[in-house]
Amino acid sequence: MISWIKGELVSSWQANNKFYILVNCQGLGYEIQTLESVFFDINSNKISEKEIILWLKHIKKEDSDMLFGFSTKDQRDFFIQILNIKGIGSQIGMSLLNKFSLNQLITAISNNDKKSISTVQGIGQKMTERIILELKSKVINKEIEKENLNINNFLEKNKDLDSIFKDIDLTLQSLNYSKKEIKNLFPKLINNIKNSSLEKESISFENLLKEAMNYLDHK
C-alpha cells in the first residue's frame, strides 16, 4: 500500500472542480487528485515543484485505480474516516476538505453545525446528519488525545508543575471529584499559566488547588 510520495512535479491541471498533479518519483509518473489548497500552493510556489511530499490514500476498484494526495497525515486520516461512512464516496470527501480546513470541519462536526456542512455540493440533510453521527465521537476523542498530549508535553518540560498537578489530582480525588472532572479541568489551568493570567509567584499548590476548586464549583 502506498502511504506517501516524494517527487518532482511534472504537470498540474484542473477539471470539473477537481485538482490533479502528475508527480515523477524515481522515473514513474503518479497521477494524484489533490486538494484545491495543495494545488494552488504548488502553482504559487509555496510548495517546491522539485520536492513535493504528499500523504496518499490509494483507492483500487474494478474499473479504476486512484490516488488522493494531502499535505498532512491528519488530512489523509480524516479523509479515510469519511470514506468509512456508508454511502459516502471519495469525491464527497474531497469536496468537504476543499470547502473547509480540517479544523473548521472538526469544529462544525463537534458543534452539530448541519447548516455549514450541508452547503457542500452533493451533501443533503440526511447525509449531513450521517456524517455528524458517525464522526462526532471520533473527532472529539481525537481532540482530547491531542489535548492530553499537549498537557503531558508541557508538564514534561516543567517538572515543578508536574509535581504540583499530580498532588492536585490526588487531592481532588480525595474530595470525591471524578477523574473525568479533574481531567477536563487541567487544560483550563494550564492555559491560564501559558496565557500568564496567573502571576509566576502565585503558581503554587495552594493557589492552583484554590483555582481548580473554583472552576469545579462553578462549572
Curated annotation (Swiss-Prot):
Gene Ontology molecular function: ATP binding; four-way junction DNA binding; four-way junction helicase activity
UniProt-recorded name of the protein: Holliday junction branch migration complex subunit RuvA
Domain notes: Has three domains with a flexible linker between the domains II and III and assumes an 'L' shape. Domain III is highly mobile and contacts RuvB.
Listed HAMAP family: DNA_HJ_migration_RuvA
Function statement: The RuvA-RuvB-RuvC complex processes Holliday junction (HJ) DNA during genetic recombination and DNA repair, while the RuvA-RuvB complex plays an important role in the rescue of blocked DNA replication forks via replication fork reversal (RFR). RuvA specifically binds to HJ cruciform DNA, conferring on it an open structure. The RuvB hexamer acts as an ATP-dependent pump, pulling dsDNA into and through the RuvAB complex. HJ branch migration allows RuvC to scan DNA until it finds its consensus sequence, where it cleaves and resolves the cruciform DNA.
Region (Domain III): 161-219
Residues making up the signal peptide according to the UniProt record: none
Region of interest: Domain II: 72-150
Annotated organism of origin: Prochlorococcus marinus subsp. pastoris (strain CCMP1986 / NIES-2087 / MED4)
Location(s), subcellular: Cytoplasm
Record Gene3D superfamilies: 5' to 3' exonuclease, C-terminal subdomain, Nucleic acid-binding proteins
